[in-house]
UniProtKB/Swiss-Prot annotation:
One of its GO terms (biological process) is translation. Keywords: Ribonucleoprotein, Ribosomal protein. PROSITE patterns: RIBOSOMAL_L36 (PS00828). Belongs to the bacterial ribosomal protein bL36 family. InterPro entries: Ribosomal_bL36, Ribosomal_bL36_sp. This is Large ribosomal subunit protein bL36. The lineage of its organism: Bacteria, Bacillati, Mycoplasmatota, Mycoplasmoidales, Metamycoplasmataceae. Disulfide bonds: none annotated. Signal peptide: none annotated. SUPFAM superfamilies: Ribosomal protein L36.
Length: 37
């Protein structure tokens, strides 16, 4: 899990979702997991 100021999709499987006002990137590749904060 990476915490970043700006999150973006890294590959085609990445999805940006909003969970309890926190933006997240979920992906099949665990390395691509991100959270904005």
């Amino acid at each position: 899990m990476k915490v970043r100021a700006s999150i973006k999709k890294i590959c085609k499987d990445c999805k940006i979702i909003k969970r309890r006002s926190i933006n997240r990137v979920i992906c099949l590749i665990k390395k691509h997991k991100q959270r904005q904060g």
